[in-house]
Amino acid sequence: MDKKQFGRYLLAASLYFTVSVLTPAKPATMYLPLFIIERSINANVVHYDAKLSDDGNLDPQEPVVAYWIMAAKDGHRQELNLLERAKAYGFTVHADASGRFYHMELVSQRRRDIHVYRDGDIVRAETLIDGQPAYLQKVFVSARHLVVIPTPDYVEMFGVDVKTGAPRSEKVRPGR
């Protein structure tokens, strides 16, 4: 390499270094846990997380994401499939007119409104548990296999009372 080529190389390297140092890195997308669904069938768990935008607020395009943690296998993350999203673990979510929270409904619990919102450094999934406002933490589904598709015997919701901080739970049987 002659002096001219070496000079060009040095110039290119210093330009690359300067641009990479001065160009701000895009912040990584941040997710905060909302609640989980556990099942009696196996140890796999569905996680629902709040997705935050760059400004730290709930992402208006996709405020909530859901995925499996395959604990019965090796603990890897796996997306919900189409059938799971449509019939069991999917959800709808839309912004409230006030702009303070999002309405979320699980496809398996259409009549139970969940309010998702930012509360300081954490996010909340607030719903009624046993008739009282509570922060939802976990849903447990007791099910049995009939042929191929699991059939739920009951669903139990667990959370913390918004006012008192006391544990709350409610058992719901399908069709009731």
Task: Label the model's feature ranges.
Residues G175-R176:
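Short, solvent-exposed mixed-charge patches
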Residues L146-E170:
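Short, exposed beta-strand-loop hairpins at the edges of beta-sheets
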Residues D2-L11:
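Bacterial N-terminal signal peptides that target proteins for export
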Residues F140-R144:
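Beta-sandwich interaction modules
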Residues R39-N42, A95-G99, Q109, V147-P152:
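Short, ordered beta-strand-loop transition motifs
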Residues A12-S20:
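Bacterial N-terminal signal peptides
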Residues P24-L82:
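N-terminal export/targeting and maturation segments
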Residues V64-Y135:
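Mature extracytoplasmic domains of secretory-pathway proteins
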